Every structure is written in C-alpha cells, then in structure tokens.
Amino acid sequence: SRNYVRQKKKVARCHEKIRSQRRDYLHKLSRRITDQYDIVAVEDIDMKAMGQCLHFGKSVQDNGYGMFRNMLDYKLTWKGKKLVKIDRFFPSSKKCSKCGKIKKELGLSERVYRCTCGNEMDRDRNAAINIREEARRMLAV
C-alpha cells in the first residue's frame, strides 16, 4: 500500500540521519585524537564475535567501534603517526596495573578493580593503563 511505502521511506531517512551523525562524530573524535597524540594504542577486539554474544548483541554493532578504529588507522598513517594494536587475548582488565597480578575471574558486573596489593580503581581505567604499558613494551622491543 502507499502508506507502507511512505512509512518505509521515513524509517530509511531516520536510519540515514543516525548513520550520518555517527560517522560525523567518529570523524571529529578520530581527528581530535590524531591531532593530539603521535602514538595511539587500541585493543584488537573481535567485534563480530562480540556482536554475536548474547549479552551485547546489536549494541556492539551500533557503536561503530570498527569504523572508528579504521578512521584512526588511516588518519594516523596519513600523518605519519602510529596505531598500536594490542592482542585481544592480553588480559588488560584482569591484570593489576600496579603489581601485575592477574585475576582469574572478573565479571562484567564488577566495575571497580580491586587487587590484593591494595590497588582499587575503575576497571576501565585499570585496563587503559595496562594497554598503555603493553604498547610501550611492544614499541621498546
């Protein structure tokens, strides 16, 4: 029917607008990062596998991480800078950024990383420090 076609076009326009806004935001963010830093380290995450995970599903595909990483890669390369990819099996979240001890279990619901050495911080900040240090180690070799 005519109404169905009209509504389908409206939905398509909404999706196009969202796609355009996401792309614009990611371009601006990647530009700001490449202007500010000479070396950027990222975790080499398997986005396809995360998208198929029951816990994350479509939200992982909607965030545009793969597109963002590609933008960072080509912009850094274009400026003669470096993107360091940390292996996806590196225990960035489970490793203590102070003492180096690796936790055996760390659930996604645990938002604060607590170690027996007394280190206590946001788990994402702990992972970011570990990724930075692993990138430094990789570049030194």
Regions found by a protein language model. Give the residues of each.
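Positively charged, helix-rich recognition surfaces that bind polyanionic ligands
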Residues: S1-V141
